[in-house]
Amino acid sequence: MPGFKFGKDQRLLRASEFQEVFDLNTCKISHPNWLLLAKFNTSYGSRLGLVIGKKNIPTAVGRNYVKRLARETFRKSDFPCSIDVIFLARKGADKLNSQDMALLLQESWCRLRQRCEASKAKNA
């Protein structure tokens, strides 16, 4: 199944890439269990960076669960513009069941897409 891979070209890898999104984000979506920060990029396509701290989700099982669902829903959502997104987990993100979390993440990705498109249209 080559079409379902989440490769290195779809991830933020270096600290400088993360810092750039933290410093220059143009879109922000807040949810009680996570925060999404996004910045337009020029040449990469859409990329995702995950920040899931041990302080907010203490167990490795919980952190891996949140990462897996965030990656999967991001991969399935199609972003028409090239953006870098940081998913920042908050306390309680691992307490949601997978169906609820997947649905809430899809809604968050849709809101982020709409907000980024509006921001891009405003700046054009």
Roles of regions detected by a PLM:
Residues 1-124:
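Positively charged, solvent-exposed patches that mediate nucleic-acid binding
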